[in-house]
Amino acid sequence: MAKQEQAPDRANDVFALTSFLYGGNADYIEELYAKYEDDPNSVDPQWRDFFAKLGDNADDVKKNAEGPSWTRKNWPIAANGELVSALDGNWAEVEKHVADKLKGKAAKGEAKGAAGTPLTAEEITQAARDSVRAIMMIRAYRMRGHLHANLDPLGLAEKPNDYNELEPENYGFTPADYNRKIFIDNVLGLEYATVPEMLDILKRTYCGAIGVEFMHISDPAEKAWIQERIEGPDKKVAFTPEGKKAILSKLIEAEGFEQFIDVKYKGTKRFGLDGGESLIPALEQIVKRGGQMGLKEVVLGMAHRGRLNVLSQVMGKPHRAIFHEFKGGSYTPDDVEGSGDVKYHLGASSDREFDGNKVHLSLTANPSHLEIVNPVVMGKARAKQDLLVGRTRDDMVPLSERAKVLPLLLHGDAAFAGQGVVAECLGLSGLKGHRVAGTLHFIINNQIGFTTNPAFSRSSPYPSDVAKMIEAPIFHVNGDDPEAVVFAAKVATEFRMTFHKPVVIDMFCYRRFGHNEGDEPSFTQPLMYKAIRAHKTTVQLYGEKLIAEGLVTQDDIDRMKADWRQKLEGEFEAGQSYKPNKADWLDGAWAGLRTADNADEQRRGKTAVPVKTLKEIGKKLVEVPKDFHVHRTIQRFLDNRAKMMETGEGIDWATAESLAFGSLAVEGHPIRLSGQDVERGTFSQRHTVLYDQENQNRYIPLNNLQKGQAIYEAINSMLSEEAVLGYEYGYSLSDPRALVLWEAQFGDFANGAQVVFDQFISSGERKWLRMSGLVCLLPHGFEGQGPEHSSARLERYLQLCAEDNMQVANVTTPANYFHILRRQMKRDFRKPLIMMTPKSLLRHKRAISTLAELSGESSFHRLLWDDAQYNKDEGIKLQKDAKIRRVVLCSGKVYYDLYEEREKRGIDDVYLLRVEQLYPFPAKALINELSRFRHAEMVWCQEEPKNMGAWSFIDPYLEWVLAHIDAKHQRVRYAGRPAAASPATGLMSKHLAQLAAFLEDALG
């Protein structure tokens, strides 16, 4: 019998003694062998005996150990510490380290053998191997424990087939070893532990109601912090009696609110939180713990599920206001216009105080397009961080300062896994120009997407897996264990406030009813909904737990529910006659601004700048420090610009832009320009950030104009349109003093962010009363570069224009560009500006302005006259107005094509009139101009195909103007490219033929 018991032990010993022979250890053994060949005494005696028997050629061994000739020496650099060795599977290193520690302990008499005598060499080797096996088992729990955690409240999820990967037997331990104390060097907060003691901590930590994924993190400090925070005999999920009662109270509020609405408004859509009520106490914990750690503000973004609950129970929105909206009432005061939105899209803001720490909360309004609010929230948070710090220079804001504002995003499981903007936002999280010191992501994982099962909505085990790409820690938690959910929220908040990095909570829960309250989920998920109908609510389960603990009685719970219902009844009555008071959208940073209420008002703003100021700015724009080595081409660029400033003539597009930025910065307006390659400019035109050719140091002239100026930021963004544009829109919502610009690499690529244009930029003010002064610069122009580098799809933006919602412009002179940029900041309201910007005009000999056109009484012109009428020394002199036979109206670059062709042909009776601002349409100005030419033929000329460009938009406007002036020709004739499916041809010969054809049509 004794022999039989010894057999498994012997097998385990053999396994331990030969495990080094497995392929994964080959590199290590080769290195060890090379050491042995250099000096046999440098390795352990057992290795010495082993290598002595091999008898290999010493040179061959060294060569093999060194690896191929192209490998980099001493690379990769190894992280230090036995813990890290254990994490990367370098077990031989761990064994040596542990053996050394045990030898030291034995020498001091701290480590003794079974008989109480000092450890022998053999016992030290055995103890070290036990330690390694234990650490291997601990590592397995850290890596894979989450797969065995009790996460699904419904118990429908299949357990993975793990081949006993977490069993002690897998690591060479038998029940006979269970009473032996094993040295684990404080890895679980214990110096020595038995196998059962380890398992108790490991199962509780990694296989309970919380499953943690963190072993994909490469930073040892972050990894060690998580381990120390959750591992150990004293690290249980534990709450005080008061804490438990507070959790129960919030759960009763959350459940009671949903049930109350269900009774009062049967069948009305509310997208209830039923089944995910633990979210509410978790959000409270995030705000509370964050406030204790220095958090000042939380910017929330979330979808529809549970939104009304968050608004009322977390944000403190009066219940009577929500009931008023359910009744069909407006959420805005009577004197405020707006088209409105459904109640589960609306935003709100409030202040909450915990333990004397006041935290401001704001919930961002959003459309039904899932996850698109994420970048908007991040942008808002970034702007709030900048405002809090009060940035004046291009210095880095410490992440510890940024951490005072937290973006908190709530997601659905299917949307987090499915929507690409989620991955884009994760990609932004670590970038200098877009980081926000970590977003906290909370996934309400109800294990279904409308009617689609997870197996059909994602290819990964968890909805949160996409977050692993940025090494975010992920806390999976069972929503039916509110204490575990609140604990996970607490640890996640601490991680974010400590390391200023994103973190994810994935709360497994369920959706008690259909996608909305009029839906029947059993059509498509009969088994799931059978289980849900039989499943107790979170309040019932947690109430029973607290009753069992003797903390409350059933009567206490019933009384809490009744008191809450009574409060809601009172609010319901008040909601019948509720009237919203002053709306809050012009408070705080927006104080002093107003809503633009009259489309006919003067909207030019004071945009001119004195010549003296412009010259001072221009002088600074071309100065660089003495020891700064500028690229010689850039030096020529700066020299040319210096000449422009000296003479006041020949101001090109990029110079006008820099003067606009510089003058605004001097006046106290921060400039934030973001997009792909914006520092240099797609067309090598901007160069607002200079690089030293010897050490790559940066120098930004626009940040060195004068003391006390505002900051200029040019941010080369990641290669994304949707998230980056959403982010910049969000930034513009929080800081109306800042000129925020997003530039597309080519305007053609802007439609990658179409949702942001449609759902936010064009309609946000009408839906949610939220103004934005965002500028979108979209390079546009037909120059033979093919269908994807010609058109910003001007027609799309014009189609979105109505109700004075935004501005669309296609300007042709640097002066007008200067004024329209400054106009964004020089009025007491804000409107988005969509601008078609030039490519070939950046260096066109005619597309230049003078300093005089930027100063004095100059301003933005919505219409621009024919240069031949006002400029001296032109190739032709136009006839008097009465003799003009045709007026060709146009917008953008095509004006210069028409101008040069007319000059070439010597035509003097065709007038060219530019429409610089297409919306709001300058009807009155056009009436004034065109009344000069009542008898002339009217032509609209554009370079875009007929079904694109401004034609469809402008035709009815022009018809109205012609009727108004009683023109001889009541219809405008079209001249331009014929209708086309693709915006432009890819053949230069065809491009030139089309250009010649429509110029003939317009001028012939």
UniProtKB/Swiss-Prot annotation:
One GO MF term: oxoglutarate dehydrogenase (succinyl-transferring) activity
SMART domains in the cross-refs: Transket_pyr
InterPro entries for this protein: 2-oxogl_dehyd_N, 2oxoglutarate_DH_E1, 2oxoglutarate_DH_E1_bac, DH_E1, KGD_C_sf, ODO-1/KGD_C, THDP-binding, Transketolase-like_Pyr-bd
Claim: Transport is one of the keywords in the record: no
Catalytic activities: N(6)-[(R)-lipoyl]-L-lysyl-[protein] + 2-oxoglutarate + H(+) = N(6)-[(R)-S(8)-succinyldihydrolipoyl]-L-lysyl-[protein] + CO2
CDD domains: TPP_E1_OGDC_like (cd02016)
Role played: E1 component of the 2-oxoglutarate dehydrogenase (OGDH) complex which catalyzes the decarboxylation of 2-oxoglutarate, the first step in the conversion of 2-oxoglutarate to succinyl-CoA and CO(2).
Family classification: Belongs to the alpha-ketoglutarate dehydrogenase family.
Subunit structure: Homodimer. Part of the 2-oxoglutarate dehydrogenase (OGDH) complex composed of E1 (2-oxoglutarate dehydrogenase), E2 (dihydrolipoamide succinyltransferase) and E3 (dihydrolipoamide dehydrogenase); the complex contains multiple copies of the three enzymatic components (E1, E2 and E3).
Protein name: 2-oxoglutarate dehydrogenase E1 component
Organism of this sequence: Brucella canis (strain ATCC 23365 / NCTC 10854 / RM-666)
Gene transcribed to yield this protein: sucA
